[in-house]
Amino acid sequence: VFQHYENLPRINPSVTTVQRLDTAEHGDDVYTEVDLCVGFICRQIYEVQNMTWQVDAERHNLRATVDPSRSNLAYGTGSWTFVDCGEQQSCLDFRAEVEPDFWIPPVIGPWVIQRSMRREAIVTSEGIERLAQHPDAR
């Protein structure tokens, strides 16, 4: 489900555009546009991320690294680790770090941003689960 980048808008509706730019030895370069609201401030994030998969017997790990020269993020990394939890279940560990390359009003502190990112992570994990159970669902 998650390996097919074109599924991202179905997984999380905040993702409005996905385009695979390049596939190379170092991974896939993927362009995305994401509409995010933090508090009362909404912003479109555009980014090119290099996506690399690492697979072994125990886990599947997708790592994303933002290319700041082609994004409105100064820095960004993400890691999605999927492990088998038995009984046809997978567990997901998601970690991300981002630094925007645009002004954020001082009233929006780190706590508000973390809360918004946590909400997006939950929406994404629920979307992965929904799509895994019902591949034809929107």
Model-derived features with residue positions:
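Residues that form generic nucleotide/phosphate-binding pockets
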Residues: V1, R115, L131
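Hydrophobic pocket/interface hotspot
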Residues: V1-F2, L8, M51, L92-F94, ...
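Hydrophobic ligand-binding cavity/cleft-lining segments
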Residues: V1-H26
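Generic helix-packing signal
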Residues: F2, F82, P100, S125-I128
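Glycine-rich portal/gate segments that line the openings of hydrophobic small-molecule binding cavities
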Residues: Q19-S71, V123-A137
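Beta-strand/loop substructures that line and gate deep hydrophobic ligand-binding cavities in soluble
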Residues: Y46-E47, T65-R119
